[in-house]
Amino acid sequence: MKIFLCLIAVVFLQGVVGFHVEREYAWKNISYEGVDPALFNIDNIIPTGFVHDAINKKIFIAVPRRSPQIPFTLTELDTTKHPERSPPLSKFPGSDKLINVYQPVIDECRRLWIADVGRVDYKGDEQKYPNQNAVLIAYDLTKENYPEIHRYEIPSKIAGSNTIPFGGFAVDVTNPKEGCGKTFVYITNFEDNTLIVYDQEKKDSWKISHGSFKPEHDSTLSHDGKQYKYRVGLFGITLGDRDPEGNRPAYYIAGSSTKLFEISTKILKEKGAKFDPVNLGNRGPHTEAVALVYDPKTKVIFFAESDSRQVSCWNTQKPLNHKNTDVIFASAKFIYGSDISVDSESQLWFLSTGHPPIPNLKLTFDKPHIRLMRVDTAKAIRRTRCEVKPRKP
């Protein structure tokens, strides 16, 4: 037992100190730049997703409208103007009519994609935010004020249930060197356990169902000494390296599962194709996650785990099992990892909301609970089981 406790202590110490975390934003509560604090409720400002534009040094952060008094559901943080630890968020200049956004994604053409679910997650504001079909929108980050350049309304029969069931999503530009027109978007639905595929060129969408999308068991969230059960299906998806034909492995996870699956995007891009994924293996007990990301530089997938308060890794060049996974960050302060991404400069970013999805959860705001961390991917895996060193000649 003493050895076990010592190992836990070492992991937590290294997670905070030893893995070269180069920047940390930490908020007790989030404010909006230029907005009277009386117009919003700080208790409700809980971000769930983000993405970093390494060229403009800006972070786009989604603050879903789960509760009233949220001025903007998509925000912007200019890291050059706000080097402070707890900066305010600014209104996203591309649109002021968004209803409810959970995650932004940047593709290789520097388009910012969002999936606006079209409804708020509470009752009482129907006139202000009337229910609409979910919509995919792309903005051009290369131009001032990010003009909208693409919009697609997802049919209700494809989007799924009447709640807000979207998890993560991935954008697949088939061949960026030849242009951006041939693009597919893959959106997870964790309630219906389906994967939505959108073909930008044909402006068509369809959904895929499969047993691997379903939750495997009840998952546990720990908070204030109590344990809460939850059960969610397909949630996270990330894309690997392209082959010469522009196809890539799509890696996906259910939120209540520790297995990782792979399917070729060649199958996803063909409407009606036989869906036959590969079960890559099991990451081990208590490693459930709702977000994952592939880093092309290191060939590593990183997982923001839901309850363990850690970020783990697996090198895709090795078989997947608990002996080939490792922890690159752990901290008691990293409460509920909700999103993780790698930017164009191979910087790994990960977000904890401090707000696990527990009904009627009451938070105190006496210390920072929302955290956004950054670390270079190569440094993150150094001296871990996820590092694969080149063979000596």
Swiss-Prot record:
Subcellular location: Secreted
Pfam families: MRJP
Keywords on record: Glycoprotein, Secreted, Signal
Main location: secreted
GO cellular component entries: extracellular region
Signal peptide interval: 1-18
Residues glycosylated per entry: N29
InterPro entries: 6-blade_b-propeller_TolB-like, Royal_jelly/protein_yellow
Highest taxon of the lineage: Eukaryota
Tissue expression: Female salivary gland (at protein level).
Function: Probably modulates blood feeding of sand flies on vertebrate species by binding and sequestering different mediators involved in the host response. Binds biogenic amines. Binds serotonin with high affinity. Poorly binds histamine. Does not bind dopamine, noradrenaline, adrenaline and octopamine.
Family named by the database record: Belongs to the major royal jelly protein family.
Name of this chain's protein: Yellow-related salivary protein SP03B
Organism from which the protein derives: Phlebotomus perniciosus (Phlebotomine sand fly)
Organism ancestry: Eukaryota, Metazoa, Ecdysozoa, Arthropoda, Hexapoda
